[in-house]
Swiss-Prot record:
Mg(2+) binds at K201, D203, E204. Its EC number is 4.1.1.39. Substrate binds at N123, T173, K177, R295, H327, S379. This is Ribulose bisphosphate carboxylase large chain.
Length: 475
């Protein structure tokens, strides 16, 4: 143990404030396979050296406090402290740098995303010595990830449950998101599922409001999907949002969904909280329910480049906490999402092993071992003209979700669903025949219009719709 980090009581106690870097900046440290590693984008206050700022992040997110305390002598800081082990500049940003911090595994409760985040992204984000702080990535070691159940079922089990293979799944968010009665809501669900969609969805803020109580919605939606299943011969689902004001109420809704025999429920995992989400995920695995996750509130946390937390971290947290689907941006629609960044965290959701790749924002190699994968959901401002790009970008293991792009069809909900299903089938067939969807996608859609009047009408309505804004989150 070096003199700088000696903590034995025999050394004696000297009160006062000391530099964080004397204890928590350790560039000679060799990271362990069991360490949780973090990459922080740090913007220190003027005059604060990078080493001191990086050490402050390590200290305040682990064992440190602002002054020396005599109880330091009652434990071994070398065993429990976080360490800033590397600092690298951010190209083009003179006042920013990336601080790499290693945390010993014993700092965290097993199977608890709540505890993990309370430490790593807790009080340190309000630290006065820092102008801004952003958590860019985490490396979760197998020794820790194996303490989590993870997704209730995962990609392959979901495909087996639905008996659907070789293509992305199709969904639709029912609109208007608020104000419909339960019966009219169920009617919209039925029309969309009958037209060819695999799923329909409650919007994230549909819970149990005066115009539509949750139990009524659940009953009418279950009736709609059973009727659509009988007519189409396909397994259908509706994401019944179980999010509620208390965990007890959330579980009551999930239990009722199971009693209705529906295949899937939904949760808003950030507004609902990780403790509630993990509780629901465990119930879903035990009772055969798929779990769709909405990321409402994520942009409050992840959209600013200098402060907060990147969505790739929230995606990893969700995979550990549990969910079979999660919204992940579209690249081409109305919501934020640069292509390489989006594909980086899509791989972190789906794959077992993801190599470090800074060109896609992946700071650490991530080994999920046997944890099931999560289907990314592309949703937000997409329509039939986006189908070739979405198929090419996200591949088969995804859910493509068209709300306005289904319900906005001039002939109604069912024709809107038909248009999306025909466009998807045409794109998948063209891809399987070796055609380049990135180059020939529009031609593929136009050809399909010749034998689908529903698709032709949709193409005419949305031919001029574009969302041309620069992305904020870029590499």
């Amino acid at each position: 143990m070096s003199p700088k980090t000696e903590t034995k009581a025999s050394v004696g106690f000297k009160a006062g404030v000391k530099d964080y870097r004397l204890t928590y900046y350790t560039p000679e440290y060799q990271t362990k396979d069991t360490d949780i590693l973090a990459a922080f984008r740090v913007t220190p206050q003027p005059g604060v050296p990078p080493e001191e700022a990086g050490a402050a992040v390590a200290a305040e997110s682990s064992t440190g406090t602002w002054t020396t305390v005599w109880t330091d002598g009652l434990t071994s800081l070398d065993r429990y402290k976080g360490r800033c082990y590397d600092i690298e500049p951010v190209p083009g940003e003179e006042s920013q740098f990336i601080a790499y911090v290693a945390y010993p595994l014993d700092l965290f409760e097993e199977g608890s995303v709540t505890n993990l985040f309370t430490s790593i992204v807790g009080n340190v984000f309000g630290f006065k010595a820092l102008r801004a702080l952003r958590l860019e990535d985490l490396r979760i070691p197998p020794a820790y990830s194996k303490t989590f159940q993870g997704p209730p079922h995962g990609i392959q089990v979901e495909r087996d449950k639905l008996n659907k293979y070789g293509r992305p799944l199709l969904g639709c968010t029912i609109k208007p998101k608020l104000g419909l009665s339960a019966k009219n809501y169920g009617r919209a669900v039925y029309e969309c599922l009958r037209g060819g969609l695999d799923f329909t969805k409650d919007d994230e803020n549909v819970n149990s409001q005066p115009f539509m109580r949750w139990r009524d919605r659940f009953v009418f939606c279950a009736e709609a999907l059973y009727k659509a299943q009988a007519e189409t011969g396909e397994i259908k689902g509706h994401y019944l949002n179980a999010t509620a004001g208390t965990c007890e109420e959330m579980m009551k809704r999930a239990v009722f969904a199971r009693e209705l025999g529906v295949p899937i429920v939904m949760h808003d995992y950030l507004t609902g909280g990780f403790t509630a989400n993990t509780t629901l995920a465990h119930y879903c695995r035990d009772n055969g329910l798929l779990l769709h996750i909405h990321r409402a509130m994520h942009a409050v946390i992840d959209r600013q480049r200098n402060h907060g937390m990147h969505f790739r971290v929230l995606a990893k947290a969700l995979r550990m906490s549990g969910g079979d689907h999660i919204h992940a941006g579209t690249v081409v629609g109305k919501l934020e999402g640069e292509r390489e960044v989006t594909l980086g965290f899509v791989d972190l959701l789906r794959d077992n092993y993801i190599e470090k790749d800074r060109s896609r924002g992946i700071y650490f190699t991530q080994d999920w071992v046997s944890m099931p994968g999560v289907l990314p959901v592309a949703s937000g401002g997409i329509h039939v003209w986006h189908m070739p790009a979405l198929t090419e970008i996200f591949g088969d293991d995804s859910v493509l979700q068209f709300g306005g792009g289904t319900l906005g069809h001039p002939w109604g909900n069912a024709p809107g669903a038909v248009a999306n299903r025909v466009a998807l089938e045409a794109c998948v067939q063209a891809r399987n025949e070796g055609r380049d969807l990135a180059r020939e996608g529009n031609e593929v859609v136009r050809e399909a219009c010749k034998w689908s009047p529903e698709l032709a009408a949709a193409c005419e309505v949305w031919k001029e719709i574009k969302f041309e804004f620069d992305t904020i989150d870029y590499l």
